[in-house]
Amino acid sequence: MPKRVNFSRHLEKHWLDQVAIWSSQGIGKAELNANIERMLEHHVQCKVNRGKTRNQLMGIWFDASTVDEAWHNNAIGFVQQSENVPFILHWGMLIAKNYFFADVVRFIGRKSKHYDCFTYGQAQKYIAELYGDTETVKRSLRSVLKTLVDFEIILREKSGSYKPQVMGYEIEKKYKNWLVISLMQNRGTSSRSVLDLLDDLVWFPFSFTLSVNEIDQSLFELHQQGNNLVLFRK
């Protein structure tokens, strides 16, 4: 997996909701770009930064060039079927398409197992080991943290530290196989044990369970390897 830093601007949930809805309506790239530009006009004053934010939003909910197209279309279908855009769809898209975002989330998930809070310095040290100690990496880390504050996945404390929020949000059955593929795409693999999939720290805010009966066998083959049940994408 390439260690690409691709989160230069923070995102807000209501922006993602709106872009997901527009994408589900089948509008073209030029029109979607124009819609996002108008939406961001009063939120992001700098034209250059507005363009970066727009490109990130397009990359998540419009551009399917880096992921499985059928998987991407399934997400669009879920949006079309929903009165409100389920937050878990944004999460799955971000995990599959943005490795940097996923690595920051894993750091927070690891910290949340042992500590109530973490500092920016701790996060920066960990991410610098993966991506390098550059201003681009630091800026992108700040953008991810600001995004997660907006998502209410972490809280910014008065001390300047961050407190992870374990929401315990139960994931609906219809999204589980789609999320499994999200994680496989993030990991760049077509097979993984069920235990590893469920234990991945990207799910730390949620309650993600997966029984054998919930596995879509039109998407996966199941193999028992020792004590592990392994899923292979078809």
Q: Where are each of the predicted segments found?
A:
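Eukaryotic partner-binding/assembly regions in large regulatory complexes
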Residues: 1-95, 106-107, 118
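Short helix-coil junctions and helix-kink-helix linkers
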Residues: 37-47, 125-136, 195-209
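Positively charged, polyanion-binding regions of nucleic-acid-associated proteins
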Residues: 14-23, 90-116, 171-192
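Conserved binding-pocket/active-site segment within a compact domain
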Residues: 110-178
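Basic amphipathic alpha-helical segments that dock to polyanions
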Residues: 51, 55-57, 141-151, 211-223
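Accessory, usually C-terminal, subdomains that scaffold auxiliary metal cofactors
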Residues: 157-233
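Short acidic, hydrophobic short linear motifs in intrinsically disordered regions
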Residues: 31-36, 114-128, 188-201
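Short amphipathic alpha-helical segments
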Residues: 49, 100, 137-140
